[in-house]
C-alpha cells in the first residue's frame, strides 16, 4: 500500500520542486504553467498523459488555451505520496517550453 508522506518527507521532497506550491485546505501540490500557444500546452499535456498512464497515477488538471493548471495528490492515500513527487519531477522535465514565471 502507498503511504502518505510524513511532514519531514514532504518538506525534503518539495525542496527539489520549487515551482510547486501547497494547495490550501488539501494535502496536495499545484503548479501553473503557461506556454506560447495551445499547441504547446496540448503537446505538454500529451507527454504527461502518457507518463501518467504508465504510472497509473493521473493528475487533476485544467487547460485554457496556453495555460495548464496541475494538482497532484494520491486519492488512495488521502494525500501526497512518492507517486506525486515522481510525477511532479516528470512534469517539470516535460515543461521545457513553459514560460518563466508562469
Curated annotation (Swiss-Prot):
Lyase is among the record's keywords: yes
GO annotation terms (biological process): tetrahydrobiopterin biosynthetic process
SUPFAM superfamilies named in the record: PCD-like
Membrane-spanning segments: none
First-tier enzyme category under EC: lyase
EC number(s) reported in the record: 4.2.1.96
A single GO molecular function term of this UniProt record: 4-alpha-hydroxytetrahydrobiopterin dehydratase activity
UniProt catalytic activity: (4aS,6R)-4a-hydroxy-L-erythro-5,6,7,8-tetrahydrobiopterin = (6R)-L-erythro-6,7-dihydrobiopterin + H2O
InterPro entries xref list: PCD_sf, Pterin_deHydtase
Keywords: Lyase
HAMAP family according to UniProt: Pterin_4_alpha
NCBIfam families for this protein: PRK00823.1-2, PRK00823.1-3, PRK00823.1-5
Sequence similarity: Belongs to the pterin-4-alpha-carbinolamine dehydratase family.
Protein name as annotated: Putative pterin-4-alpha-carbinolamine dehydratase
Species, as recorded: Burkholderia cenocepacia (strain ATCC BAA-245 / DSM 16553 / LMG 16656 / NCTC 13227 / J2315 / CF5610) (Burkholderia cepacia (strain J2315))
